[in-house]
């Protein structure tokens, strides 16, 4: 059949069969990509996509339609479902996709000693070998590094969202199944020490209310301090015992929390709680003792000091965990302990040590405060909307005010300056009505109550230095607010734990992969490039139209 000739306004692109050598190169490239990204372990895995050759002329519009269709298909493959089951041939938790209905293996987060004992069994050796083979690509590299290797701080910011970095982004995958309930120890976060922070700070508050001359008209009995102190001690022992079990059986998960930019600050919390309990010890336990034993300060402040040397060194030396990169409101936990330690050092009679800790804490508080206040582009953890995490801003200046008063014995200008800074920040936060609304409850919220309690204690000290009805009213108001918030959180915790049973959901933040599993195919030169010939055809069409118009003008 004869083919009609096209006029000057209709341009066609002549697409011929690709030569044998070029076709083999294209098929080899496509075959390699299929092996790399395919997750099926079946007889169809080795099948190649049929090569499409054209031996006829197609219009430019057809070329564009084919190009758009292939672009849509390529975009559809860029996102991974956040189910923990999107590895190629790799089921969640290290189970090969065999369809035999086996339960998820959580041994990847166990301690190395426990995991090595499991590997001594023959079935486990075979399973681990299959996992390694399923994760290995053609060139010998793995899709994701070992679970035992540390996750970078940038990876947490890239894979997680929220002010506490505890929510996985939609386009990210996790190592464990989201639908299945994980073991309790894996779901028990370091943030549970926030409960101890809130309760132990209440013990300090009620001791101050019972002993302060500014509130003696209330005739508050010291028994309240005793009850709160004992309850705080029981909660601290329970939480510490549970987390020690997690360290024993799931140490790899603990390492994940330590390298988390937000949760690393909660490793300071147990020692701050212990110092709070030492400061607020009931009078009936030491009625005639002016100073505490120095060993108490050494036991509680020693681990805190060595941990802050590690963290402050990372801030100072730069790198991936420099302060402008990982700064978040929870970073105040790594600062406020210096002021609490200064108070305890003064209680044991070491005034010079107390002054040293106060100076270190205040210097780093200024750095953290300025870094967060500037909202640097690299500080990704600071939420734009109001969140209870903002209450951490008032913790350090309040504690600094109390520490200065304890060291020097008077509420002078420096102590009042810190107190007024904390008071202004407190008012600026309380002025917002929706302070605790619209956010998912978390046990980490408990740690946000102790700054309010610390501000209340600082206000009581201020009322002692500046007696009067306004100062007393302010002290009672802030004390009532902090106690009410602790009661509300206590009731909410009981409801989530025993009624709704949602207090400890799956801790998705520790199950992220070391690097993103979504990979884009590397561009390579193809003998037949649809995009290239489409552009060339468009250029030829424009050139032909210009020649045709020029030819018509010459005829006229």
Curated annotation (Swiss-Prot):
Keywords: Abscisic acid signaling pathway, Cell membrane, Coiled coil, Ion transport, Membrane, Phosphoprotein, Transmembrane, Transmembrane helix, Transport. The modification Phosphoserine is found at residues 59, 86, 113, 120, 146. Gene3D superfamilies: Voltage-dependent anion channel. Pfam families: SLAC1 (PF03595). Residues 25-34 have a biased composition (Low complexity). GO terms for cellular component: membrane; plasma membrane. Residues 69-79 have a biased composition (Basic and acidic residues). InterPro entries: SLAC/SLAH, SLAC1/Mae1/Ssu1/TehA, Voltage-dep_anion_channel_sf. It is found in: Cell membrane. Residues 211-216, 287-295, 347-352, 410-418, 464-479 are extracellular. It is a multi-pass membrane protein. Changing residue 146 to F: In slac1-8; impaired ozone-triggered rapid transient decrease (RTD) in stomatal conductance. Residues 1-189, 238-265, 317-325, 374-388, 440, 501-556 are cytoplasmic. Residues 1-103 are annotated as: Disordered. Preferentially expressed in guard cells. Also detected in the vascular strands close to the leaf margins. Activated by GHR1-mediated phosphorylation which is negatively regulated by ABI2 but not ABI1. Activation by SRK2E/OST1 and GHR1 is repressed by HT1. Disruption phenotype: Constitutively higher stomatal conductance with over-accumulation of the osmoregulatory anions in guard cell. Impaired slow (S-type) anion channel currents that are activated by cytosolic calcium ions and abscisic acid (ABA) (normally leading to a decrease in stomatal conductance). Higher sensitivity to ozone. Increased water loss associated with a constitutive stomatal opening phenotype. Reduced circadian leaf turgor changes. PANTHER family: GUARD CELL S-TYPE ANION CHANNEL SLAC1, S-TYPE ANION CHANNEL SLAH3. Phosphorylation by SRK2E, especially on Ser-120, activates the channel. Also phosphorylated and activated by CPK21 and CPK23. Abscisic acid (ABA) promotes phosphorylation. This phosphorylation is inhibited by ABI1. Phosphorylated and activated by GHR1; this phosphorylation is repressed by ABI2 but not ABI1. Phosphorylated by HT1 on N-terminus but not C-terminus. This is Guard cell S-type anion channel SLAC1. Residues 86-99 have a biased composition (Gly residues). It comes from Arabidopsis thaliana.
């Amino acid at each position: 059949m004869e083919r009609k000739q096209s006029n000057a306004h209709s341009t066609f692109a002549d697409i011929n069969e690709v030569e044998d050598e070029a076709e083999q190169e294209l098929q080899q490239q496509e075959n390699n990509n299929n092996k790399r990204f395919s997750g099926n372990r079946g007889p169809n895995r080795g099948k190649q996509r049929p090569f499409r050759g054209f031996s006829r002329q197609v219009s430019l519009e057809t070329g564009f339609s084919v190009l758009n269709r292939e672009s849509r298909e390529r975009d559809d493959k860029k996102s991974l479902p956040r189910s923990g089951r999107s590895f190629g041939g790799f089921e969640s938790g290290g189970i090969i996709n065999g369809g035999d209905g086996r339960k998820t293996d959580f041994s990847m987060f166990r301690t190395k000693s426990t995991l090595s004992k499991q590997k001594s069994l023959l079935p486990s050796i075979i399973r681990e070998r299959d996992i390694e083979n399923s994760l290995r690509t053609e060139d010998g590299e793995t899709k994701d590094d070992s679970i035992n290797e540390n996750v970078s701080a940038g990876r947490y910011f890239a894979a997680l969202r929220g002010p506490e970095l505890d929510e996985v982004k939609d386009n990210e995958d996790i190592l464990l199944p989201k639908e299945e309930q994980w073991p309790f120890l894996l779901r028990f976060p370091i943030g549970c020490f926030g409960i101890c922070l809130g309760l132990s700070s209440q013990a300090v508050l009620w001791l101050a209310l019972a002993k302060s001359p500014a509130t003696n008209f209330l005739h508050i009995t010291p028994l309240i301090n005793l009850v709160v102190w004992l309850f705080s001690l029981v909660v601290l022992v329970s939480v510490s015992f549970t987390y020690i079990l997690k360290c024993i059986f799931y140490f790899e998960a603990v390492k994940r929390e330590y390298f988390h930019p937000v949760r690393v600050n909660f490793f300071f919390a147990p020692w701050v709680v212990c110092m709070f309990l030492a400061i607020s010890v009931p009078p009936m336990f030491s009625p005639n003792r002016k100073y505490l034993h120095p060993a108490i300060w050494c036991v509680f402040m020693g681990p805190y000091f060595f941990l802050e040397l590690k963290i402050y060194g990372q801030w100072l030396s730069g790198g991936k965990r420099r302060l402008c990169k990982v700064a978040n409101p929870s970073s105040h936990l790594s600062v406020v302990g210096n002021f609490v330690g200064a108070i305890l050092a003064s209680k044991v009679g070491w005034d010079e040590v107390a002054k040293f800790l106060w100076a270190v804490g205040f210097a780093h508080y200024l750095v953290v405060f300025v870094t967060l206040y500037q909202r640097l582009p690299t500080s990704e953890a600071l939420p734009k909307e109001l969140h209870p995490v903002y209450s951490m801003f008032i913790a350090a200046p309040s504690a600094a005010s109390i520490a200065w008063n304890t060291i020097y014995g008077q509420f002078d200008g420096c102590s009042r300056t810190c107190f007024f800074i904390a008071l202004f920040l407190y008012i600026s936060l309380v002025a917002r009505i929706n302070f605790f609304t619209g956010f998912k409850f978390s046990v980490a919220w408990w740690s946000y109550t102790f700054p309010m309690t610390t501000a209340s204690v600082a206000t009581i000290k201020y009322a002692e230095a500046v007696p009067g009805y306004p100062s007393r009213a302010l002290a009672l108001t802030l004390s009532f607010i902090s106690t009410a918030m602790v009661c509300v959180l206590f009731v909410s915790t009981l409801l989530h734990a025993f009624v709704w049973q949602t207090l400890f959901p799956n801790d998705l933040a520790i199950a992220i992969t070391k690097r993103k599993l979504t990979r884009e195919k590397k561009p390579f030169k193809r003998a037949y490039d649809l995009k290239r010939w489409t552009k060339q055809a468009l250029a030829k069409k424009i050139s032909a139209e210009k020649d045709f118009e020029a030819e018509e003008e010459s005829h006229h």
